Amino acid sequence: MSIDQIILGNIYTLDRKVEAICVKDGIIQYVGSKRVAQELIDENTEILDFGDNFIYPGFMDGHAHGLPAGNILGFSIDLLDGETLEDYVEITRKYIEENPGRKIYCGNNWVCGNERPTAAMLDEVSRDVPIALTTLDGHSIWLNTAAMEKFGIDEKLLEKYSANEVHIGEDGKPTGYLSEEPAITLNSKIVKSDEELQESLLIWQEYAFSQGITAAFDAHVGYFGYPSLKAYADVSKSGKLKLRTYAVRTVKDTDDVLELVELASKVNNEYFKITGVKVFIDGVVEAHTAWLLDEYGDQPGYFGVKSFSDHDKLVEFAKLANEHNMNVHCHTVGDGAVKFALDALCEAQIATGNMDQRNAFAHLQVVTPEDIKRMSEYNVIAVVPPLWTPREKPYGKKEMEYLGPDRDEDSYPIKSFLDEGAKITFHSDYPVSPIMSMPQSIYAAVKRTHTLEECEPRNLKESIGVMDALKAMTINTAYQFGQEDNLGSLEIGKIANMVVYDVDFLNDDIEKIPDAELISTIVDGEVVYRNI
């Protein structure tokens, strides 16, 4: 048997430790001892010897936004270093001065404090060229007057949305600050050229490989409208897409579901697959828009925003998706959102008899014990964010105020899902969350904090072990993607995706993990990233 690559090192397959892996045509042919592997070498075999370093199955992200990530990295105003609205205005002003001539300027990663932004503030930078700045959590957007005019943001929107979504001034008119559905919808209307989106996708792929990500879930492939999907289709067709991507797109009615089914039949391939539909059930706690069962701590009688609350329609989505071998991926932050979505999906799964549809709920900040148990019973996958578990700036104080101390301390269960037998996968939500670090995710899952900035552990009783954390980034994520026979562990017959680090995650001191250095990322048996 001719072998293309032999990979040597301290290799964790997921269920055992070996010395060598042999690869042919991107598929693992042998897993075992170095001695036996070397017998398969010929003059054409590439030897990848990683010495004393440690090799793991390729890591995968259960919920990210790849195309926006690449677009932000390559084409956007980064507001992360600002702290006040004045800072964001000045950063925007400087960027536009250094990058003149664009038809629209987009920015990301600002944080809304107690002071609400207005279009007038951004008009100081430009009254004529549209400016659209999306918050760090991706759930709100700040526009100047030119952008409001371009996208039709006026009093008519108040007939459809509440003042918690289209914020208004004392005159009753929109101020230029939008949250939840109108903000997310507007982002999809910002037109990017095909060339910019394709380049953005390749920038994202390069970044993902540099973080040890070998496959990812794109949690809303319609972020920039239809051109987003076209970019994935074009880049994968060209052979340049090597980051296997499994995607959903937000739907609002059954026609959207059927359209996505038709699109999937045309564009799905080895490296890009539409696997289901997405539904935004609620918002986020820090924006005061998560749907809670009990009222907000700072506002009696207020339970958050119900971004989607049509039970029968969600049942129909799930049934229709099931007919076409698809699943439903729900944005669920609050316990009200979880209960609503779970009621609908359980009803649909009982009707179809399919308990293996692999529906998933992402984020899961506040969840009742009863619904954790139900998620396990109905095999709804818990896509959880370990890096969000600590209490940190800038949102920690807000979350405590909005949830109250008890709900805040119980935020982001992980161990409870495992205890009930549910499948968990990890997500970064990058770039909605600006951190993508697999070692930090492992550390946060164990310690309920991270070392990237000053923060304190929260809900320590939900800590899990390192092996469970590794599974949540490998074999469990493969299961979420419906790819557990191809990805997620290093076994004969599986795709040769793996990552190499200088730390033994399973045996070294836990405090070494955050500083683990990625040595190499391997996809289809070939090195796609090398830390030189």
Model-predicted regions and their roles:
Residues 31, 134, 218-219, 246-250, ...:
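Generic beta-strand/beta-sheet core signal
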Residues 240-278, 358-366, 397-423:
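Phosphate/diphosphate-binding loops
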Residues 144, 212, 274, 283, ...:
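Conserved, mostly hydrophobic/aromatic
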Residues 319-328, 336-359, 373, 384-505, ...:
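His/Asp/Glu-enriched, well-ordered alpha-helical/loop segment
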Residues 3-7, 14-259, 279, 286-320, ...:
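Divalent metal-binding segments
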Residues 65, 271-289, 380-390:
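Non-cysteine beta-strand/loop elements that form the S-adenosyl-L-methionine
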Residues 142-143, 256-258, 392-396, 436, ...:
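Short, charged, surface-exposed secondary-structure boundary motifs
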Residues 7, 24-25, 281, 491-494, ...:
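A cytosolic small-molecule/anion-sensing beta-strand core signal
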